[in-house]
């Protein structure tokens, strides 16, 4: 009989930031006796989860993808956003061979260059500055037909903030004397990640067929009509932009389509609809043979050109565990499963040796304020069983509630989500202590601690750039170190496990054993 393992457990409370003001703070307005007691009695510290400390631009809010990459890598990982900002500033972007070839191919064949992406200054899935640079690249290289298909945000940005962005692009096309915004649609449709293919189909038809529920002469007019229908940016219905006398922008064989989102998880479904010959998410009314470019690699099995292939990370936490013959479990709900697997492993899809995974289905509801507890009860039951099983050296778990319910902007629901989490943490803490294991509780970024934007008075549906908590539960006598960041977590776990820290990990342990 093998010896029962005492696991090192990392619980990531997604979107659970730290803010001392109670006003509009779902975490402080919730009843959280368990987290309150842990914070009062256990070794703890605050760590940075945004900006330069996670490889993002200064003061840029953190997000789940960035957070989990840094958590697993044990070093600051410069994100695609920062990398692209530098490329554009230094103008190497304009010489990227994949992008220039795609534009030249369309231009030389008299075909259109279609550019699609999330038109947002949010910097989470994309940045409008990158899309602007792509428009400039296409124009500079002589493309005549340049069509922008704008996905609208309102989730990583205020709920009604797209007008300024659309106007900026309409002005740009006017100045260039060519190109135009061809369609607008909310990210709810174009950027689903939970196999809700009926939504994706609407965005696909909009772009391939130039058919939507609505039509407008200009993008700004289309947006204003959506607001009049009470649709915020995220939920704007498929709208064709087509003034009298204009040729429509329906996609044709031989056209180029460049997807300017850099974050993978919400880019995959619509990309597969365009690229995969055997696609079966919905019956495509029109299949177009496009020259399709992904800005970054959205998945290894999507076979199409990539402008910025991933830089590989060596000796992430998961890989280091495998090299040291340790067993590990990754567990979460659908919404954050990719984060504790693919992103935590530095963009590696395949599990490492000794790595097991458990996926709990997220509830099928339109928005998570309708079920703020999500699937946390089932997730906790499975997590507790795994802790007590004695099978795993380490377990990584993500609870999505604080983030997914925080995104709805509904304060009462976010409070319920936080209270559900407190109950879960109680069970997890008891399980860890009962087997003599160790537990770190942290977050990947903030969200639920700021539910209203003090400047606008609108619901605050985006992430924050506030610090996140880090709490230690275990038998070791440890002292907390101040000034930490997400990339210090993996080295902290290794040191608490008594393991060597690989040299690639430049993070420092945040709990020193006394």
Curated annotation (Swiss-Prot):
Its EC number is 5.4.2.12. It comes from the Bacteria. One of its GO terms (cellular component) is cytosol. Keywords: Glycolysis, Isomerase, Manganese, Metal-binding. Mn(2+) 2 binds at residues 14, 64, 444-445. The active site is at 64 (phosphoserine intermediate). Pathway: Carbohydrate degradation; glycolysis; pyruvate from D-glyceraldehyde 3-phosphate: step 3/5. GO terms for molecular function: manganese ion binding; phosphoglycerate mutase activity. Its cofactor is Mn(2+). Binds 2 manganese ions per subunit. Pfam families: iPGM_N, Metalloenzyme. It is an enzyme of class 5 (isomerase). CDD domains: iPGM. Substrate binds at residues 125, 155-156, 187, 193, 263-266, 336. Mn(2+) 1 binds at residues 403, 407, 463. GO terms for biological process: glucose catabolic process; glycolytic process. It catalyses: (2R)-2-phosphoglycerate = (2R)-3-phosphoglycerate. HAMAP family: GpmI (MF_01038). Catalyzes the interconversion of 2-phosphoglycerate and 3-phosphoglycerate. Belongs to the BPG-independent phosphoglycerate mutase family. Monomer. This is 2,3-bisphosphoglycerate-independent phosphoglycerate mutase. It comes from Salmonella paratyphi B (strain ATCC BAA-1250 / SPB7). The gene is gpmI.
């Amino acid at each position: 009989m093998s010896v029962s393992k005492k696991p090192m457990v990392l619980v990531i409370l997604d979107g659970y930031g730290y803010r001392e003001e109670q006003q509009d703070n779902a975490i402080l307005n919730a009843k959280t006796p368990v987290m309150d007691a842990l914070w009062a009695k256990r070794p703890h510290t605050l760590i940075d989860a945004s900006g330069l400390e996670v490889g993002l631009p200064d003061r840029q809010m953190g997000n789940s993808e960035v957070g989990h990459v840094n958590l697993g890598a044990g070093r600051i990982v410069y994100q695609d956003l920062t990398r692209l900002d530098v490329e554009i500033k230094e103008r190497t972007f304009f010489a990227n061979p994949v992008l220039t070839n795609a534009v030249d191919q369309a231009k030389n064949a008299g075909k259109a260059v279609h550019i699609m992406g999330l038109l947002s200054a949010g910097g989470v899935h994309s940045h409008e500055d990158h899309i602007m640079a792509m428009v400039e690249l296409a124009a500079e290289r002589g493309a005549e037909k340049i069509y922008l298909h704008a996905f609208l945000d309102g989730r990583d940005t205020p709920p009604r903030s797209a007008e300024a962005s659309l106007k900026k692009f309409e002005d740009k096309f006017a100045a260039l004397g060519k190109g135009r915004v061809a369609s607008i649609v909310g990210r709810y449709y174009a950027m689903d990640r939970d196999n809700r293919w009926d939504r994706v189909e609407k965005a696909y038809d909009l772009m391939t067929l130039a058919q939507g529920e609505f039509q407008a002469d200009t993008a700004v007019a289309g947006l204003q009509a959506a607001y009049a229908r009470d649709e915020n940016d995220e939920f704007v219905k498929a709208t064709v932009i087509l003034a009298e006398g204009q040729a429509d922008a329906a996609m044709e064989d031989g056209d180029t389509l460049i997807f300017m989102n850099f974050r993978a998880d919400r880019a995959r479904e619509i990309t597969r609809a365009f690229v995969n010959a055997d696609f079966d998410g919905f019956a495509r009314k029109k299949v177009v043979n496009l020259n399709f470019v992904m800005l970054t690699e959205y998945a290894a099995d999507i076979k199409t050109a990539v402008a910025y292939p991933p830089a590989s990370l060596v000796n992430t936490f998961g890989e280091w565990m495998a090299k040291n013959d340790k067993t590990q479990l990754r567990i979460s709900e659908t919404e954050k499963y990719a984060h504790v697997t693919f992103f935590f492993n530095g963009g590696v899809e395949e599990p490492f040796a000794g790595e097991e995974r458990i996926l709990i289905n997220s509830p099928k509801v339109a928005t998570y304020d309708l079920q703020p507890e999500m699937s946390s009860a089932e997730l906790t039951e499975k997590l507790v069983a795994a802790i007590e099983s004695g099978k795993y050296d380490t377990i990584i778990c993500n609870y999505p509630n604080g983030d997914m319910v925080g995104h709805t902007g509904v304060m009462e629901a976010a409070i319920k989500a936080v209270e559900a989490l407190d109950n879960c943490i109680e069970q997890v803490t008891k399980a860890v202590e009962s087997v003599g294991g160790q537990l770190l509780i942290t977050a990947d970024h903030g969200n639920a601690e700021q539910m209203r934007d003090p400047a606008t008075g609108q619901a605050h549906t985006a992430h924050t750039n506030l610090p996140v908590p880090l709490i230690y539960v275990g038998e070791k006598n440890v002292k907390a170190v101040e000034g930490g960041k997400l990339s210090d977590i993996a080295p902290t776990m290794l040191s608490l496990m008594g393991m060597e820290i690989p040299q690639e990990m430049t993070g420092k342990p945040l709990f020193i054993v006394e």
